[in-house]
Amino acid sequence: MGENMIKSEDLVFKYVNSEEQNEKLAINHVSMEVKNGEFLVILGHNGSGKSTMAKHMNALLLPSGGKMYVDGLDTSDIENIWEVRRRAGMVFQNPDNQLVATIVEEDVAFGPENLGVDPKEIRERVDDSLKAVGMYEYRKHAPHLLSGGQKQRIAIAGILAMRPKCIVLDEPTAMLDPSGRNEVMKTIKEVNKKFGITIILITHYMDEAAQADRIIVMDKGEKVMEGVPREIFSQVKKIKSIGLDVPQVTELAYELQKEGVDISTEILNIDEMVNALCQLK
């Protein structure tokens, strides 16, 4: 269906408050493209429109104006809804809200069962998906006994079992501790690299965003920045003016530069910082 997995054209979305009879503009004429196989992060603080944008990517919300295309399918066409949701799976913030069965493998099988997949193929899909997220040995466990990071990996396995082309993750690490966050990020990157599945990650964690192929920054319902992580985070002043932070090492480089140290602000990780400091005379 072409090289774009997701494409929005002049997208507008308004939340209507029926009690107060007023509208809130959540997305204001946003156009964006996400390539097949890309790992894109959408960054923004609360109320920026990033989660609303995510919900348009698997037709949980439909545009008030403009268009959203998923793998070439217009989400406004009611006949496309189920196919859109099959091609673009979604993982949410709270893992407990996404798990529906009392045994891990039954939970992962839930999606393909509802698609009417043959039982033998369901078995293969469940095993393959659990292996892909490193949770195969937990297949007979009860999901409620797992850690937050493990639960999110089960949620990702459940989406993988439906054989999507794209996974949209709406702040999947927001409720996790640092080790759980690392587990989930490792899984997301492996799914993207090994299987070529397009990943759209909504986050407010800068260290997660730094690992993406490309970043889109949203503010007040508009797309305000777009580029590779190095390009985005080197604009420290602009990022801070939007109310966001930059990765800690980038912040350190920025502060050193302000003090007259000859160092680039295009530093994203500790190894790069060590190399840059070692080269100073």
UniProtKB/Swiss-Prot annotation:
Gene3D superfamilies per UniProt: P-loop containing nucleotide triphosphate hydrolases (3.40.50.300)
Family statement: Belongs to the ABC transporter superfamily. Energy-coupling factor EcfA family.
Annotated EC: 7.-.-.-
Ranges for domain ABC transporter: 6-245
Transmembrane spans: none
Signal peptide per UniProt: none
Mode of membrane association: Peripheral membrane protein
Protein name (database record): Energy-coupling factor transporter ATP-binding protein EcfA1
Molecular function per GO: ATP binding; ATP hydrolysis activity; ATPase-coupled transmembrane transporter activity
Organismal lineage: Bacteria, Bacillati, Bacillota, Clostridia, Eubacteriales
Top-level EC class as recorded in UniProt: translocase
Annotated GO CC locations: ATP-binding cassette (ABC) transporter complex
Subcellular location(s) per record: Cell membrane
Transport among keywords: yes
SMART domains on file: AAA
Stated role: ATP-binding (A) component of a common energy-coupling factor (ECF) ABC-transporter complex. Unlike classic ABC transporters this ECF transporter provides the energy necessary to transport a number of different substrates.
Organism per entry: Clostridium perfringens (strain SM101 / Type A)
The keyword Membrane is assigned to this record: yes
Self-association state and partner proteins as the record states: Forms a stable energy-coupling factor (ECF) transporter complex composed of 2 membrane-embedded substrate-binding proteins (S component), 2 ATP-binding proteins (A component) and 2 transmembrane proteins (T component).
UniProtKB keywords: ATP-binding, Cell membrane, Membrane, Nucleotide-binding, Translocase, Transport
Residues annotated as binding ATP: G44, H45, N46, G47, S48, G49, K50, S51
Name of a matching Pfam family: ABC_tran
